[in-house]
Design a protein with these regions (language model features):
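Membrane-proximal soluble regions of multi-pass membrane proteins
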Residues: 1-21, 203-213
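Alpha-helical transmembrane segments and their cytosolic membrane-interface
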Residues: 12-31, 75, 123
Length: 214
């Protein structure tokens, strides 16, 4: 980052221009790492913070690759899934997520997206989005996967409207917006989930249902 600024975005040997994206990505990655360690108090929870940092790095790759090519690398998705397995094995006491929650998270969003994908013949979204949410759901658990989808749909709708207004093109990559949702859910799924339940009145409805069942 420093060398790019000193050299004014040019190669030292040949003088060719170096894209600002490299610096933007590196800066974004560093800032996200700092925020994750601050959020999880990384000095006392280094493994949990490290896993989320790796997740964020993978999401940055997904974001820019899908934005440019409308393709999501399968190996990156597998890596995210492996992070989910590692989180359950090593951090389940910190996350409070059970194996059941991780497994439900794997299916609860990916299966509906798969159905939509098959019905629309991948016109609404691609299989990469399905695989991404399956892997992310394994990491986030049930509530986190739902929050990630909610944020992805909101940001995707806004981004899609802006793109259609600017270029008239209604086709856009959904992966970047899902990546934003996954990143937000990795840090704030409990807070957003609780707020949404209160806002929609679902908390009260569930409490009343439990009273009836009892």
């Amino acid at each position: 980052i420093v060398s790019w600024c000193i050299l004014r975005g040019k190669c030292r040997s040949c003088g060719a221009k170096i894209s600002a994206r490299y610096t933007i990505v590196e800066t974004l990655n560093a800032l996200l790492y700092l925020w994750v360690f601050y959020h999880f108090n990384g000095i006392f929870n280094p493994l949990r913070a490290a896993l989320v940092c790796l997740l964020f790095s993978a999401l940055i790759v997904v974001f820019f690759m899908d934005w440019d090519t409308q393709l999501i690398n399968t190996y990156v998705v597998i890596f995210i899934g492996l992070l989910g397995v590692a989180e359950y094995i090593f951090c389940k006491d910190q996350t409070g997520l059970t194996l059941k929650s991780h497994l439900i998270g794997f299916f609860i969003v990916s299966v509906p997206l798969l159905i939509i994908c098959l019905i629309t013949h991948e016109k609404a979204m691609g299989m990469g989005d399905v695989y991404l949410m399956a892997a992310a759901g394994l990491f986030l658990g049930m509530q986190g996967a739902l929050v990630a989808l909610l944020i992805g749909l909101i940001t995707g709708s806004i981004g899609g409207l802006i793109q259609k207004h600017r270029s008239g093109d209604s086709v856009f990559a959904f992966g970047p917006y899902l990546s934003i949702g996954i990143a937000v859910a990795a840090l704030y799924s409990e807070q957003i989930g609780s707020w949404y339940m209160d806002f929609t009145g679902l908390n009260e409805m569930m409490n009343e249902a439990m009273l009836i069942i009892r």
